[in-house]
């Protein structure tokens, strides 16, 4: 299993696939599938049956998972960057390899 360098709450840009160039915030990371759900990216239509809580039913838009190899982290400067790890004050922290700033 590979090390996931993207976490929930990170801002990412899609670098490959149909949604290339779109940006969004990571809502959830699916570790076992190496995928992430990104806000506003890879939208799908979900057909819902009428139920007691939703008597109308209908078609809902929702985000589908996207593979993490198609995502790149955006640092504070707005550039895509790779992620590195270093120790600071005895704690392991992530840092941007482009700007060398702690994420």
From Swiss-Prot:
Record keywords: Ribonucleoprotein, Ribosomal protein, RNA-binding, rRNA-binding
GO biological process, one term: translation
Record GO terms (molecular function): rRNA binding; structural constituent of ribosome
Gene3D superfamilies hit by this protein: 2.30.30.30
One Gene Ontology cellular component: ribosome
Coiled coil: none
SUPFAM superfamilies membership: Translation proteins SH3-like domain
PANTHER family associated with the record: MITOCHONDRIAL RIBOSOMAL PROTEIN L24
Subunit structure: Part of the 50S ribosomal subunit.
Family: Belongs to the universal ribosomal protein uL24 family.
HAMAP family for this protein: Ribosomal_uL24_B (MF_01326_B)
Function according to Swiss-Prot or TrEMBL: One of two assembly initiator proteins, it binds directly to the 5'-end of the 23S rRNA, where it nucleates assembly of the 50S subunit. One of the proteins that surrounds the polypeptide exit tunnel on the outside of the subunit.
Annotated NCBIfam families: rplX_bact
Protein name: Large ribosomal subunit protein uL24
Source organism: Christiangramia forsetii (strain DSM 17595 / CGMCC 1.15422 / KT0803) (Gramella forsetii)
The organism's taxonomic lineage, starting at the top: Bacteria, Pseudomonadati, Bacteroidota, Flavobacteriia, Flavobacteriales
């Amino acid at each position: 299993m590979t090390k996931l360098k993207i976490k929930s709450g990170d801002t990412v840009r899609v670098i490959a696939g149909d949604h290339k160039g779109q940006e969004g915030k990571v809502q959830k990371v699916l570790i076992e599938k190496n995928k992430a759900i990104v806000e506003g990216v890879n939208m799908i239509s979900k057909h819902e049956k009428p139920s007691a809580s939703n008597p109308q039913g209908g078609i809902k838009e929702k985000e589908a998972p996207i593979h993490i190899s198609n995502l790149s982290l955006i640092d504070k400067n707005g550039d895509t960057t790779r992620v590195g790890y270093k120790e600071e004050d005895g704690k392991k922290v992530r840092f941007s390899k482009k700007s060398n700033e702690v994420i």
